Amino acid sequence: MKIVHHGKITLPLILAPALSAFALPAFAAEDTMVVSATPGPISELDTPAAVSVVNGDDMRQAAPRVNLSESLGSVPGLQVQNRQNYAQDLQLSVRGFGSRSTYGVRGIRMYVDGIPATMPDGQGQTSNIDINSVESIEVLRGPFSALYGNASGGVINVTTTTGTQPPTLEASTYYGSFGSWRNSVKATGATGDGTQAGDVDYAISASRFTTHGYRDHSSAQKNLGNAKLGVRLNEASKLTLLLNSVDIDANDPGGLTEQEWHDNPTQAPRAEQYNTRKTTKQTQAGLRYDRQLTANDDLSVMMYAGVRETTQYQSIPVAPQLNPTHPGGVIELARHYQGIDSRWTHRGDLLSVPVKFTTGLDYETMSEKRKGYENFVVENGTTVLGEKGDLRRDERNLMWNVDPYLQTAWQFTDKLSLDAGVRFSSVYFDSNDQYIVGKNGDDSGDASYHKWLPAAALKYAVTDAWNIYTSAGRGFETPTINELSYRDNGQSGLNFGLKPSTSDTIEIGSKTRVGNGLFSAALFQTDTDDEIVADQSSGGRTTYKNAGKTRRQGMELSADSQFAEDWRVKMAWTYLDATYRSNACGTDSCEGNRIPGIARNMGYASLAYAPPEGFYAGADIRYMSDIQANDENTAKAPSYTVASLNSGYKLRIQESWMLDVWGRVDNLFDREYVGSVIVNEGNSRYYEPAPGRNYGVGVNLSYTFM
């Protein structure tokens, strides 16, 4: 669906006490989100789901433009934490889904211009998202996210800029604490207005980021490129080429115990001993074809392919690796992935009821070559750590899924509508063990998982300005290949005993337009069977288990208010009670305990003065309640509140040049806090510290060809 902001409305009396002090804003840009659960463009107000839109220009305003954690704090239900570890990516969770991840993103489906940033098995990453190119980011929560298939506890959809006339060149630089540098260039433009055959639009960007890192042994460098080229074939069809490449070389500082964190949060003793590090190279290309078949029928086909290569050195001691079944302390991965998603949309009437149908087929596949090596060598009788040694693992893994889906939207009356859909998700794994030596036997195997995923929402328009809705759906999450890759107690082979989880969600919500702004509220409950959680994590390696039954209950509130010209305030609050409903701790009972990695309360507020030119300034404050670090709830990261300030000046020089000079300070009051936790870390090294007060300055310069 396409989410747009429009229309001037009045506040329903039931919500007036909460927002009587505010007149919500007119949005300067059209925010969009394509949600296959509801075909066709409708407004955000009319969307029967919890969804939030973050504008790309807002993300870049006086910001480093390096991590999504800089700008997504205003999204309720989304917990985004910076590990200060570029080897392991950000920690993202939506309503608690994804909190178990010790690296990368799990439990959430991510897309960039329609291409999955989530692998077919459910493992995702944010490292290839170029903030300089972002047009908007949309976060979908609740039952309808399940219609995206496997591992979709939530959906994050990134849309990049489409070039328009007149052409523009932009260069920007940022320098911050800990020796952090980012330099970027971008070019956008078009040869026509995009409606005539032969019209071409383009958006090309590149950036380089380097940092010494806040902690010891946390330096990193990243090169990122993104390109989007569109060609209008005729008045009814368009072809879009998408290219993306990222190259990361990062040290891995690892986690700290509570005592180590208090003694010196910047230390990384084991990381330096083992020289833990990770390199990642990914290149992908996509081709999207859109055609209007008739006035009532549309066709869209997306094809993509890519390769991702990773080498990681872990802090695993020598002694465990002497076990002949141990896979070693160095991981080498080579992944090739591709897919195609084709869909047809029809608009018409059925039994005199206006209806939209979207049906399609989504096919994804990935092949992985996984090798493991010892992380030490012996030279002249001396053991040298942090070097690639003998081969200890060699396997070829295949994974693919084939998902047909159908979504419908029915408009029964002017006030009552129904959105409903179903997806049949089939996921297949196959592993071929090619390292059969001595006591290390053949650990080949295969598994397949199948599940019907229905979702439906009923919406009622109380007034033109106020909609209420109720929705329900079923989600499905298989283990990722990484989660299958290791068994407990150092056993060899894949963990095919790990089962997929299923989740049933119900939600009720209310959306109210005030002026041209929006106030949203949602209540939800999710019950999960066989939830996949971290069993034990040590030395950078994590094993997983099924936790039986869990429950998530919560509430989300958000508001966006413009109370005077160029002044804007945003607020969001999330309450999430996520608990085990059965024992996930073996001999010790943790039924009723909180699921680790999830904050029970999150709050955000920001105030900005942002005229199109001249002086601007902003401030924000974030609150995070304590986060349990293990299943037993015997360790936790304390709650914290941090504030940030930014200010800058935009100067237009003649008509073509725009200069933007800015500065910011984060963690204004120099709070000491934990940025994220490593769930169930076996040596109690749960804590990944966040930096104290830190600073940054930047300059952006653009030229528009008039």
Labelled PLM ranges:
Residues 195, 288-290, 298-316, 461, ...:
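Membrane-embedded beta-barrel scaffold of Gram-negative outer-membrane proteins
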Residues 168, 175-210, 215-253, 277-294, ...:
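Transmembrane beta-barrel wall of Gram-negative outer-membrane proteins
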Residues 249-263, 367-374, 428-437, 446, ...:
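Surface-exposed extracellular loop regions of Gram-negative outer-membrane beta-barrel proteins
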Residues 244, 470, 506, 560, ...:
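Conserved C-terminal beta-signal and adjacent last beta-strands/turns
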Residues 344-346, 351, 413-414, 426, ...:
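Gram-negative outer-membrane beta-barrel transporters
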Residues 129-172:
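A beta-strand signature from Gram-negative outer-membrane beta-barrel systems
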Residues 238-244, 279-436, 461, 519-523, ...:
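Face-selective signature of the C-terminal outer-membrane beta-barrel domain
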